[in-house]
C-alpha cells in the first residue's frame, strides 16, 4: 500500500519532482477547469516591472497571492490567475537611457522617439523567463500564457476609455501647478511617487538676504534655504500676528527688520543694536521693496515685489520673513491669490537656467547656488550665510534631488471625490486592520489632485487632441473613435505612431494630440478594466471582474497601486476596486538595511530555495511579522530553523506512520470511522476538527497569521503528544482494535493535515499525499475540497483535559531544565496547586499521563501554595505612594517584617492593619509585592493560576532508574546509527560492571522490551561504543541483529 519513506529527505529535490508531476499532468489547469461554472472569486494581480529580477521582497506577496487563490479554489470557487506586466513608464525608459548612453529629453529626441520606443519594447520583457521560472519554482500557480501587458493595444484602449469617462465627469483638467519634478527624467511626478523615494539628510546653504524697502533706507532680513530660487523672487511673506522689530545695527549702521524672537539668534550682544520700534507683521503688508535681481522687472506692474502675510510663516527658523518665488506650493498660492504676475519658470527640462536668467544660464539649479551666493555677497545683499541640515526628497528612479517647480500638467480632480473615497475605504477589509484608518485612511484624508501626465515617451498617450487655432479639446475613448475622426487606420497607440494622427478642424486649424503620456500608475489603477479589454469585449460579465474579492501587495502600495485602484474605482463606479487586501511589510537584510546587490547583504533567493526548499522559505515568510505589514530582517538561519522545526517534524510524523504501516500491512478503509474509544484518538480527532473550523474562519477573514499559528500548534500536538504517547500502540506485536484505531486515526490526521496545509506549503503536502492517497482519491492534493469541520467529533472537554495535562508537563519540564534535572531521571513527587475545582478533577483523571510524561512517582493536588513555599512581602510603592504620603517609609519597613501567616491572610482577602505613629493603615493584596521562597528540596514554578512543585531529592533507587533510561536511549541511538529497522530484534553486548549489574537486577525486562533485545550478553569482543550514562559513569556496549 505505502512506499517506504526515507528518514532524511532532500526537500529541494522532492519539490523539483513535484513540479514535474504538476506540469506533466496539468494539475494547475485541472484545478481551474474543475471549478468552471462555479461561483467566481475575483483576484487582481498587481503588475511588476520585468526590467529587474524578483527578490525576497517579491516572494512575500507572491506567496500570499498563491495561498488565497489555492484556498478559494479548494473552497469550490472559480479563480482565474493571470499574471500581468507593467511595461510602460519611467523605470523602462531609465533602463533604456542607460543602455544607449543617453540622458534627458533632448538627447532622446535627437536619438528619435520612434527608435527610443523600439528599444523600450525590446528591453521591457527582458527578464520575463527568469520571473516565470522563479515564481513557478516558488510554488505559485499563475497563468503566464494568458497574462496581460500594459503595452498591449487592447489594454491601452481600455485605459483611454477610463480616461474619457473621467474627462466627461469633469474629473480631468489641465493646469499650471507647482509639482515635484525629476530633473534627470525631465518630468513631473505625483505626490505618492515622491513618497516612494527616499528622504535624505542634506546640508543646504541657509541665507539671510537684505531686501531694501522702496524709498527708504531700511532693509527686510529675508531667509531662504534655496538660493537658486532668488533670481525668480516675486514677493516676500511675513506672519500677520508675528511681532517684528525694527532695529539699528550699530556695526553695519543699517536699519533692519526681523522677527523679535530671532534677535538672539542673530546678535550675541544686545548692545550691538538698538530697537527702534516693534509691530505686528500686518503693518508690513503691502510695502514695496526693491528686487535683488532685475530679470523679471516687468512683473512689478502685475503686483510683484510687495510684502504679503501668510499663515505658514513662523519664527522657528530664519528671521520670520521669507521670500516668495513660484517654486513652492505655498508661494504659488499666495502669488495667485494676491497678484496677477505671470508664473515664471526660467528653467529648461533638465532644471538648468535658461537665457531668462543670463548670469547663470546653463547651470543646474543646485550647482548655481554657489555662484548666486557669490553674486549677492559682491553686491552687499548677503547678511549671513550658514548651513541648514534637513531631510529632502530624492527621485525614486534616478536618486537625484527632486525640484519643485510650476509646470503645466493634467490632473485627476481627487479633491472633488475625496468624501466618496473615504466612504469607499470603509467597505474594504484591510489586513492588518489598522491601515484602514491609519496609513491608507490618513493618506486619503490628505489626498491632493493627482498629476497624471508625464513629459516622456514610452507610455500610454493622453488621448486629447487640441485644435491649433481655437484650443478646442476632443477626448478620445477608443481606437474606433479615433479612426472615425481622423479617417486613418490605427495599428498602434504609442506616442511615436499616434502623434502622426492629425485631422483638420472646421475652424481652419488642425487637431494635434497633446504631447504628454499618462503616468504608468494610472494604467496600473485601470488594470481591472484594461486587463479584460473592458468594455470592448462583449462576453465579459462586469460583476465577475469588479470589484476584486482579493488583492495583496506591499505596504508601499498604500500610496501606489491600492491608491490608484481606489481613485479610479471610485471615480468610475463610486465603489471600491477591491473588497479584501493583505498588506505585507518590507523585507530587509539581516543588518536592517535595504537589500542591495552592491552591499552584497543577502543570499541569492534561488540558492535559498535550492538549499532549504521553497516550502521552508514560504513558511518562513508567512510566519513572520512581514505578513502584518511590519518589516522583516531576513535571515537564511530563519529559513533553516523552519525546515528543522516544522518541515522535518511533519516529515518525521509521516515517516513514522508509513514505517509501521508497512510492517503491519495496514490498509486504510474507504470510510474511516471517527468514533474511537481511546482518549488520545478522541483528542487528536477533536483537535483536528477544531483546527478545520478555525482555518475556514480565519482564512476567510484573510488572517494568515492566526491560521499559521493554529496549524503549527496542531503539528506540535500531533508530533509531541499524540504520536509520542501512542508509540507503544504501534510497537506492540498484536494487531488488535486499539492498534488499528491508532493507525486509522494517525492516517486520517496526517492526510487531513496535508490538505489543510496544501495552500501554504504545496510541495511537501503533495509528496506525502501521493503516498497516502487511495484509488478513490483525487489525482492531486490540490484538486481536493478544503476540509470542513465535523462538529460531532469536537469534544471540548477532552481537549481541555489533555491541554491542561500538556500545560502541566510543559511547566514541569521547564522546572527540571531550570534546575538541571534531566527528564530521564525520575522524581518522587509533583505538587500541583490550583484553586479551580474543575481543573483539580481533570488533573485526577489525567494523573497517569502526567506522571508518565514528567517521570514522577506520585502526584499531589493542592488548593493553595502554603505546603510548597513560604511568603515574604515588599511594599508596592506604585499603589501605596498615592495614599500614604509621609508614612510610606515606615509602612514599607513594617511590610518587610510581615510573617508568612500574615501574608497568607492578606492573600485570602483579609484586610491587614498596620499602625504607624498615631495612624492606622489597612493593607490589601494590591498593596504588596509577593516573593516566594521554596521549602527544602522543593523547586517551584508559577504560571497564571497554576503553581507546580517538584521534589528535587533524588534517592539511590531513583538515580538507578534514571541511569537505566539513559542506557536505553544510548542503545536506541546506536540502532539508528547502524540503520537497524525499527522491527529488528537484537543481541545486546555489555561489559562487566557493578552499575550494569544493579540495573539488570531491577530493570532487565524494561531494557529488553524497549530495545527489542532478545539477549543481554557479557562479551568484551563485541563491544563497539563507549557511552556516557551520567557525569562520570561510562560503559561500553555493542549490538547486532539476531
Curated annotation (Swiss-Prot):
GO cellular component, one term: cytoplasm
Catalytic activity: tRNA(Ile) + L-isoleucine + ATP = L-isoleucyl-tRNA(Ile) + AMP + diphosphate
UniProt EC number: 6.1.1.5
Cofactor(s) recorded in Swiss-Prot or TrEMBL: Zn(2+)
Chain positions of motif 'HIGH' region: 48-58
Main location class: cytoplasm
Extent of motif 'KMSKS' region: 594-598
Location of this chain's protein in the cell: Cytoplasm
Cited SUPFAM superfamilies: Anticodon-binding domain of a subclass of class I aminoacyl-tRNA synthetases, Nucleotidylyl transferase, ValRS/IleRS/LeuRS editing domain
Annotated binding of ATP, by residue: 597
GO biological process, one term: isoleucyl-tRNA aminoacylation
Class of this enzyme: ligase
GO MF terms held by the record: aminoacyl-tRNA deacylase activity; ATP binding; isoleucine-tRNA ligase activity; tRNA binding; zinc ion binding
One of the Pfam families matching this protein, by short name: Anticodon_1
Source taxon at top rank: Bacteria
Keyword terms of this UniProt record: Aminoacyl-tRNA synthetase, ATP-binding, Cytoplasm, Ligase, Metal-binding, Nucleotide-binding, Protein biosynthesis, Zinc
Record-linked CDD domains: Anticodon_Ia_Ile_ABEc (cd07961), IleRS_core (cd00818)
Family of this protein: Belongs to the class-I aminoacyl-tRNA synthetase family. IleS type 2 subfamily.
NCBIfam families assigned: ileS
Protein function: Catalyzes the attachment of isoleucine to tRNA(Ile). As IleRS can inadvertently accommodate and process structurally similar amino acids such as valine, to avoid such errors it has two additional distinct tRNA(Ile)-dependent editing activities. One activity is designated as 'pretransfer' editing and involves the hydrolysis of activated Val-AMP. The other activity is designated 'posttransfer' editing and involves deacylation of mischarged Val-tRNA(Ile).
Entry domain remark: IleRS has two distinct active sites: one for aminoacylation and one for editing. The misactivated valine is translocated from the active site to the editing site, which sterically excludes the correctly activated isoleucine. The single editing site contains two valyl binding pockets, one specific for each substrate (Val-AMP or Val-tRNA(Ile)).
Quaternary structure (record): Monomer.
Name the record gives this protein: Isoleucine--tRNA ligase
Annotated organism of origin: Borreliella burgdorferi (strain ZS7) (Borrelia burgdorferi)
Gene designation: ileS
Amino acid at each position: 500500500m505505502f512506499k517506504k519513506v526515507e528518514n532524511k529527505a532532500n526537500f529541494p529535490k522532492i519539490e523539483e519532482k513535484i513540479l514535474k508531476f504538476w506540469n506533466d499532468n496539468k494539475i494547475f489547469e485541472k484545478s481551474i477547469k474543475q471549478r468552471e461554472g462555479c461561483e467566481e472569486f475575483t483576484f487582481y494581480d498587481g503588475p511588476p516591472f520585468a526590467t529587474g529580477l524578483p527578490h525576497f521582497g517579491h516572494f512575500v506577496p507572491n506567496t500570499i497571492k498563491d495561498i488565497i487563490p489555492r484556498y478559494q479554489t479548494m473552497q469550490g470557487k472559480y479563480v482565474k490567475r493571470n499574471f500581468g506586466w507593467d511595461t510602460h513608464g519611467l523605470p523602462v525608459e531609465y533602463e533604456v537611457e542607460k543602455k544607449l548612453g543617453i540622458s534627458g529629453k533632448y538627447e532622446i529626441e535627437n536619438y528619435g522617439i520612434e527608435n527610443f520606443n523600439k528599444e523600450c519594447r525590446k528591453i521591457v520583457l527582458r527578464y520575463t523567463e527568469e520571473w516565470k521560472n522563479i515564481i513557478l519554482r516558488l510554488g505559485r500557480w499563475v497563468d503566464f500564457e494568458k497574462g496581460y501587458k500594459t503595452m498591449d493595444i487592447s489594454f491601452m484602449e481600455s485605459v483611454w476609455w477610463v480616461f474619457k469617462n473621467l474627462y466627461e465627469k469633469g474629473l480631468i483638467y489641465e493646469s499650471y501647478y507647482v509639482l515635484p519634478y525629476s530633473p534627470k527624467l525631465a518630468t513631473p511626478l505625483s505626490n505618492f511617487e515622491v513618497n516612494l523615494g527616499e528622504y535624505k539628510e542634506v546640508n543646504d546653504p541657509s541665507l539671510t538676504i537684505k531686501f531694501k524697502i522702496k524709498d527708504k533706507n531700511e532693509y527686510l532680513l529675508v531667509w531662504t534655504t534655496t538660493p537658486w530660487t532668488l533670481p525668480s523672487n516675486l514677493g516676500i511673506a511675513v506672519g500677520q500676528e508675528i511681532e517684528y522689530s525694527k532695529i539699528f545695527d550699530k556695526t553695519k549702521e543699517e536699519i533692519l527688520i526681523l522677527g523679535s524672537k530671532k534677535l538672539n539668534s542673530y546678535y550675541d550682544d544686545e548692545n550691538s543694536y538698538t530697537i527702534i520700534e516693534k509691530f505686528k507683521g500686518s503693518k508690513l503688508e503691502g510695502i514695496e521693496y526693491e528686487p535683488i535681481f532685475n530679470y523679471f522687472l516687468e512683473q512689478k506692474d502685475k503686483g510683484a515685489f510687495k510684502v504679503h502675510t501668510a499663515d505658514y510663516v513662523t519664527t522657528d527658523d530664519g528671521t520670520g520673513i521669507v521670500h516668495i518665488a513660484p517654486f513652492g506650493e505655498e508661494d504659488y498660492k499666495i502669488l495667485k491669490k494676491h497678484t496677477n504676475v505671470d508664473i515664471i519658470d526660467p528653467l529648461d527640462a533638465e532644471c538648468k537656467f535658461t537665457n531668462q536668467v543670463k548670469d547663470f544660464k546653463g547651470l543646474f539649479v543646485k550647482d548655481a547656488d554657489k555662484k548666486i551666493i557669490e553674486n549677492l555677497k559682491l553686491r552687499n545683499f548677503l547678511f549671513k550665510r550658514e548651513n541648514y541640515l534637513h531631510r529632502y526628497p530624492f527621485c525614486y528612479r534616478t536618486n537625484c534631488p527632486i525640484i519643485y517647480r510650476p509646470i503645466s500638467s493634467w490632473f485627476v480632480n481627487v479633491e472633488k471625490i475625496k468624501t466618496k473615497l473615504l466612504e469607499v475605504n470603509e467597505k474594504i477589509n484591510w489586513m492588518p486592520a489598522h491601515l484602514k484608518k491609519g496609513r491608507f485612511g490618513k493618506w486619503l484624508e490628505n489626498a491632493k489632485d493627482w498629476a497624471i501626465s508625464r513629459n516622456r515617451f514610452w507610455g500610454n498617450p493622453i488621448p486629447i487632441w487640441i485644435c491649433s487655432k481655437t484650443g478646442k479639446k476632443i477626448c478620445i475613448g477608443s481606437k474606433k473613435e479615433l479612426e472615425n475622426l481622423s479617417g486613418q487606420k490605427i495599428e498602434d497607440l504609442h506616442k511615436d505612431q499616434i502623434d502622426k494622427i492629425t485631422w483638420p478642424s472646421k475652424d481652419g486649424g488642425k487637431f494635434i494630440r497633446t504631447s504628454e503620456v499618462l503616468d504608468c500608475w494610472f494604467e496600473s489603477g485601470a488594470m481591472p478594466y484594461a486587463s479584460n479589454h473592458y468594455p470592448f469585449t462583449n462576453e465579459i460579465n462586469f460583476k465577475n471582474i469588479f470589484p476584486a474579492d482579493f488583492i495583496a501587495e506591499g505596504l508601499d502600495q498604500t500610496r501606489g497601486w491600492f491608491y490608484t485602484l481606489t481613485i479610479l474605482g471610485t471615480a468610475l463606479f463610486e465603489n471600491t476596486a477591491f473588497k479584501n487586501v493583505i498588506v505585507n511589510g518590507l523585507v530587509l537584510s539581516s543588518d536592517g538595511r535595504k537589500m542591495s546587490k552592491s552591499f552584497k547583504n543577502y543570499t541569492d533567493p534561488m540558492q535559498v530555495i535550492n538549499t532549504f526548499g521553497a516550502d521552508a522559505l514560504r513558511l518562513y515568510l508567512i510566519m513572520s511579522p512581514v505578513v502584518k505589514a511590519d518589516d522583516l530582517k531576513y535571515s537564511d538561519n530563519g529559513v533553516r530553523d523552519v525546515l528543522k522545526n516544522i518541515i522535518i517534524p511533519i516529515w518525521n510524523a509521516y515517516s513514522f506512520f508509513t514505517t509501521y504501516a508497512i510492517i503491519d500491512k495496514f490498509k486504510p478503509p474507504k470510510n474511516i470511522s471517527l468514533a474511537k474509544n481511546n482518549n488520545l484518538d478522541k483528542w487528536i480527532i477533536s483537535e483536528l476538527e477544531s483546527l478545520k473550523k478555525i482555518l475556514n474562519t480565519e482564512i476567510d477573514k484573510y488572517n494568515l497569521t492566526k491560521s499559521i499559528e493554529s496549524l503549527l500548534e496542531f503539528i506540535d500536538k500531533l508530533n509531541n503528544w499524540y504520536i509520542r504517547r501512542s508509540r507503544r500502540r504501534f510497537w506492540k506485536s498484536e494487531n488488535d482494535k486499539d492498534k488499528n484505531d491508532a493507525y486509522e486515526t494517525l492516517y486520517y490526521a496526517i492526510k487531513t493535515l496535508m490538505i489543510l496545509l496544501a495552500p501554504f506549503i504545496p510541495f511537501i503536502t503533495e509528496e506525502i499525499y501521493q503516498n497516502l492517497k487511495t484509488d478513490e482519491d483525487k489525482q492531486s492534493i490540490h484538486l481536493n475540497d478544503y476540509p470542513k469541520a465535523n462538529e460531532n467529533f469536537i469534544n471540548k472537554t477532552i481537549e481541555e483535559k489533555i491541554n491542561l495535562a500538556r500545560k502541566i508537563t510543559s511547566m514541569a519540564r521547564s522546572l527540571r531544565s531550570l534546575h538541571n534535572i534531566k527528564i530521564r531521571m525520575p522524581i518522587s513527587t509533583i505538587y500541583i496547586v490550583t484553586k479551580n475545582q474543575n481543573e483539580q478533577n481533570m488533573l485526577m483523571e489525567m494523573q497517569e499521563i502526567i506522571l508518565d510524561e514528567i517521570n514522577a512517582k506520585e502526584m499531589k493536588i493542592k488548593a493553595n501554595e502554603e505546603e510548597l513555599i513560604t511568603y515574604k512581602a515588599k511594599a508596592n510603592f506604585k499603589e501605596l505612594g498615592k495614599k500614604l504620603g509621609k508614612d510610606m517609609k515606615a509602612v514599607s519597613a513594617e511590610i518587610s517584617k510581615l510573617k508568612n501567616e500574615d501574608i497568607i491572610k492578606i492573600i485570602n482577602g483579609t484586610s491587614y492593619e498596620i499602625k504607624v505613629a498615631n495612624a492606622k493603615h489597612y493593607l490589601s493584596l494590591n498593596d504588596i509585592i509577593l516573593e516566594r521562597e521554596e521549602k527544602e528540596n522543593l523547586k517551584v514554578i508559577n504560571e497564571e493560576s497554576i503553581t507546580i512543585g517538584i521534589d528535587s531529592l533524588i534517592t539511590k533507587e531513583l538515580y538507578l532508574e534514571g541511569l537505566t533510561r539513559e542506557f536505553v536511549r544510548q542503545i536506541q541511538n546506536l540502532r539508528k546509527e547502524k540503520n537497524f529497522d525499527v522491527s529488528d530484534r537484537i543481541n545486546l553486548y555489555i561489559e562487566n560492571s557493578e552499575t550494569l549489574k544493579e540495573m539488570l537486577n531491577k530493570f532487565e525486562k524494561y531494557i529488553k522490551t524497549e530495545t527489542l533485545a532478545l539477549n543481554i550478553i557479557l562479551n568484551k569482543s563485541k563491544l563497539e561504543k563507549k557511552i556516557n550514562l551520567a557525569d562520570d559513569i561510562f560503559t561500553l556496549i555493542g549490538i547486532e541483529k539476531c
